[in-house]
Swiss-Prot record:
Similarity remark: Belongs to the aerolysin family.
Pfam family, one: Leukocidin
Signal sequence residues: 1-29
Xref: SUPFAM superfamilies: Leukocidin-like
Protein name: Gamma-hemolysin component C
Protein purpose: Toxin that seems to act by forming pores in the membrane of the cell. Has a hemolytic and a leucotoxic activity.
GO molecular function: toxin activity
Gene: hlgC
GO CC, alphabetical: extracellular region
GO biological process: cytolysis in another organism
Keywords recorded for this protein, A-Z: Cytolysis, Hemolysis, Signal, Toxin, Virulence
Quaternary organization: Toxicity requires sequential binding and synergistic association of a class S and a class F component which form heterooligomeric complexes. HlgC (class S) associates with HlgB (class F) thus forming an CB toxin.
Amino acid sequence: MLKNKILATTLSVSLLAPLANPLLENAKAANDTEDIGKGSDIEIIKRTEDKTSNKWGVTQNIQFDFVKDKKYNKDALILKMQGFISSRTTYYNYKKTNHVKAMRWPFQYNIGLKTNDKYVSLINYLPKNKIESTNVSQTLGYNIGGNFQSAPSLGGNGSFNYSKSISYTQQNYVSEVEQQNSKSVLWGVKANSFATESGQKSAFDSDLFVGYKPHSKDPRDYFVPDSELPPLVQSGFNPSFIATVSHEKGSSDTSEFEITYGRNMDVTHAIKRSTHYGNSYLDGHRVHNAFVNRNYTVKYEVNWKTHEIKVKGQN
């Protein structure tokens, strides 16, 4: 279990002078206070919370940036969702058989944010559209008066008073928004296509990851070696997603948010078969979404007045 930590940073941004270098977040920032300009038109108050579940193989690192803007008639909160989701890829004998081996692997990683507070609304999030590139980099910017805008890359933040960026790698996977409304957003990072020794294969190919050693007794040997597996299958996924919410001022002191990290697992079977001449080979069989929503959900309470974050529950 990672030790919970709180990072508190207060920034003052003046309307009188433009920002030449807007402040970017730093997940490893130490406790400090930094003033930019004079006038205190904007106050950014930062908190960070870490939660780990060995049961689910997940670590949540959540940054809560409270935006206190005198020119905006609502409270605003930027939530940056980082951490690690282990792949939990495993190899085993299927139902204690000697000729069928199984590989359980993550077809999809799940990242979601949800609130049931009637005074809270989702107003922006990143990423928005389906993204197929290996490296994903986007920026969410804020300008005085409640104006949130997104930029396509880390370099596109020069005109913002304050900005928050995401950056992650998704080799052989694609990101897309699966569900979104005024109270929630759910992303899926899904297997796409893979380069193999026998050519490009779809993520739905029944022989995907099936190896070439039908005479081994070790289930691992029935599948391709680690060197042929992408990081999101071999190791896991480091998410970096952003959601921005607004809150009606004076309506309630606290709101609750549920943040979910997890995975949907496929199972590939490698079945030892023999030809008419007695030669052995491996035949693949696929079970899509054999285990779905293997998720770790943490409920966070946000205090809009004191800017405290409390963990209210987890599964």
